[in-house]
From Swiss-Prot:
Keywords: Ribonucleoprotein, Ribosomal protein, RNA-binding, rRNA-binding, tRNA-binding. The keyword tRNA-binding applies. This is Small ribosomal subunit protein uS7. The gene is rpsG. One of its GO terms (biological process) is translation. Belongs to the universal ribosomal protein uS7 family.
Length: 156
């Protein structure tokens, strides 16, 4: 057990353009090697493409996509009597958002479009329409939880 108390969570500052904390978290997830300016250009560029393509507010499309990506259940490995069980558990709201953003950035980078701006815009629009790799990841996680429902009584 730790000798010191719990570490205080740092409050994320809202981004300057949309005044939104989730957008800041997306920027921080996209950022590589501390290049925040580049990450901001990517995210804001993608939001501009989304606004042009869909005609809707980019932030609303982004939130719709996030709701389609964020998992509700996940499995956690638990060792009982020499056997490992995949125990389905509910995901805390903060972890839901973190996983959603992580999956979004991971599957954005894996896409085939030419620039990162296009990749991110297309992945967000796909996720908003319930398609795309990040939504498939969520479905796979939910399938695993559903398949292991029998071990739910081993919950933590």
């Amino acid at each position: 057990m730790p000798r010191k108390g719990h570490v205080q969570k740092r409050e994320v500052m809202p981004d300057p353009v949309y005044d939104d904390k989730t957008v800041t978290k997306l920027i921080n997830n996209i950022m590589l090697d501390g290049k925040k300016g580049t990450a901001q250009k990517i995210v804001y560029g993608a939001f501009d493409i989304i606004k042009e393509t869909t005609g809707e507010d980019a932030l609303e499309v982004f939130y719709k996509a996030m709701n389609n990506i964020m998992p509700i259940l996940e499995v956690k490995t638990r060792r009982i009597g020499g056997a490992n069980y995949q125990v389905p558990i509910e995901v805390r709201p903060e972890r839901r958002q973190t996983l959603g953003l992580r999956w979004l950035t991971t599957y954005t980078r894996a896409r085939g479009e030419k620039t990162m701006v296009e990749k991110l815009a297309k992945e967000i629009m796909d996720a908003a329409n319930n398609t795309g790799a990040s939504v498939k990841k969520r479905e796979d996680v939910h399938k695993m939880a559903e398949a292991n429902k029998a071990f739910a009584h081993y919950r933590y």
